[in-house]
Design a protein with these regions (language model features):
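Bacterial N-terminal signal peptides that target proteins for export
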Residues: 2-13
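Bacterial N-terminal signal peptides
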Residues: 13-22
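Bacterial lipoprotein signal-peptidase II cleavage site
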Residues: 23-59
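Extracytoplasmic substrate-binding proteins
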Residues: 71, 163-239, 336-363
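Alpha-helical, coiled-coil/dimerization segments enriched in small aliphatic residues
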Residues: 241-276
Length: 363
C-alpha cells in the first residue's frame, strides 16, 4: 500500500488511524480462517512462522519448486507452515519456525508425546509448549492438515504418493521430494524446505553450520577416515537374507560424510544408481567381507544370532565384533535418518560407538 505524505498534521493522524484499522482487519481475517489454531499450538507465538532472529531471505515471489510430481508455485511468503511425515518439522524448527501442524514421530519416541528428544528441546526453546501434532501412522490425516490452514506443506523428506500429493495440493502448495521417496539427504531437506518457506539464505547458513559441526566432531576421530563401512540389517527370525542401505540412503550418505567409505564389493551391486537399498541372500554374505565396520539396527542378542549363523558368522567384521548394532526404537536409531537437530543431539554418542567398533578391527 502506497501512502503519500501530507503536510497537514491532521491528515497524517487520520491516515495513521485508517492504516491501523486496515491492518487489524487483515489480522482478524487470517485468524478467522483458521479456527482453533492458537489453542492447538499453545499460544499465539507458536503459530508464527518467523525466525528467532526475526529475519527472512529477500525471496522474490512467486517461486517455483520442481519435484517428483511436477512443480509447485508458492505465490507469496508463507505465514502458516505445515510439515508431514519424517523430519521436515525438525528442519523448520532448526530455522526458528514453529509449524502450525506436523506429523508425530512414529519411531524412536520413548513416551506418548509423539516427539523425539531433539524436537521437544527445540520446541521448548522456541516457547511452543502445545504443538499441533498429527497422528498419521495409518495414513495422512488430511482433515487435520486442512484444519491447520497452511500456506505451504513441507514434505521434502517423505514417502507421499501421487494420490497423496494431489489431495494435499488442494489444501496448500506442497514441497515434495525431488526424485524418489525417502532418499532426500539432510542437506536437500534443508535446501528444499527452506526454499518452500522463503528462507533460502537461512537454509544455506544452517547447512554450513551443520557441516562445520560434523567436521569438528569427526576430526576428533582421525582413525575413522577411510574405513570401509556398510549399513546392514539382519533379522533373528530369518537369517537367510539381509538388507543393506546404500550410500544413496541418508543413513549411508551420512556415514560417508563422517569420512568412511562403502566397499566396492557392495557398490558394484547397485545396478540402479538411484537405489537406496539392496536385499541379498545370506549366500552373498561374502559381499561384506571387505567391511571394516558393520552398522545396523538391533541388539546384542541379534548380534549373537548373526555370529552363530553358518554363513553370516563368517563375515570378518561379525567375527571380530567390529559392529555397531543400534537398539531398535531408540532416539539414536531414529537419528539414523539425520537432520540438523538430530545430528547435533546424537553425534557424540554415534561417533563413540563407531570408535569402539574401530578399536576391534586390529584387536
Amino acid at each position: 500500500m502506497n501512502i503519500k505524505r501530507k503536510n497537514s498534521l491532521s491528515t497524517l493522524i487520520i491516515l495513521s488511524l485508517v492504516l491501523i484499522i486496515a491492518l487489524a482487519g487483515c489480522s482478524s481475517n487470517k485468524s478467522d480462517s483458521s479456527t482453533d489454531s492458537t489453542a492447538k499450538t499453545g499460544d499465539t507465538a507458536n503459530t508464527d512462522t518467523t525466525t528467532t532472529e526475526g529475519t527472512a531471505s529477500d525471496t522474490q515471489y512467486p517461486i517455483t519448486i520442481k519435484h517428483a510430481f511436477g512443480e509447485t508455485v508458492i505465490p507469496s511468503k508463507p505465514e502458516r507452515v505445515v510439515t508431514i511425515q519424517w523430519a521436515n518439522h525438525d528442519v523448520a524448527l532448526a530455522l526458528g519456525v514453529v509449524p502450525v501442524g506436523f506429523s508425530a514421530a512414529n519411531y524412536g519416541v520413548q513416551d506418548d508425546s509423539g516427539l523425539l528428544p531433539w524436537t521437544a528441546d527445540k520446541l521448548k526453546e522456541l516457547g511452543a509448549d502445545k504443538p499441533n501434532i498429527f497422528q498419521d501412522t495409518d495414513g495422512l490425516d488430511f482433515e487435520a492438515i486442512s484444519d491447520a490452514n497452511p500456506d505451504v506443506i513441507l514434505a521434502a523428506y517423505s514417502g507421499i504418493t501421487q494420490e497423496d500429493y494431489d489431495t494435499l495440493s488442494k489444501i496448500a502448495p506442497v514441497v515434495a521430494y525431488q526424485s524418489q521417496p525417502w532418499v532426500t539427504t539432510w542437506r536437500e531437506q534443508v535446501l528444499y524446505n527452506a526454499k518452500g518457506m522463503g528462507m533460502e539464505r537461512e537454509g544455506e547458513q544452517l547447512i554450513k553450520d551443520t557441516e562445520k559441526l560434523i567436521a569438528d566432531k569427526a576430526s576428533k576421530y582421525p582413525n575413522m577416515k577411510g574405513k570401509k563401512v556398510v549399513w546392514a540389517n539382519f533379522s533373528a527370525t530369518d537369517l537367510s537374507k539381509f538388507h543393506i542401505y546404500t550410500p544413496v540412503d541418508p543413513r549411508g550418505s551420512f556415514l560417508e560424510e563422517l569420512g568412511m567409505e562403502y566397499p566396492e564389493s557392495v557398490t558394484k551391486q547397485m545396478t540402479d544408481a538411484t537405489s537406496y537399498s539392496l536385499n541379498l541372500s545370506a549366500e552373498n554374505a561374502d559381499l561384506l567381507n571387505d567391511a571394516d565396520i558393520i552398522i545396523g539396527y538391533g541388539d546384542d542378542s541379534l548380534y549373537q544370532a548373526v555370529k552363530a549363523d553358518p554363513l553370516l558368522g563368517k563375515i570378518p567384521a561379525i567375527q571380530r565384533g567390529s559392529v555397531v548394532f543400534i537398539g531398535n526404537g531408540t532416539p539414536l536409531a531414529a537419528s539414523g535418518n539425520p537432520n540438523p537437530l538430530s545430528i547435533a543431539y546424537t553425534i557424540d554418542e554415534y561417533l563413540g560407538l563407531i570408535d569402539g567398533a574401530i578399536s576391534k578391527i586390529n584387536g
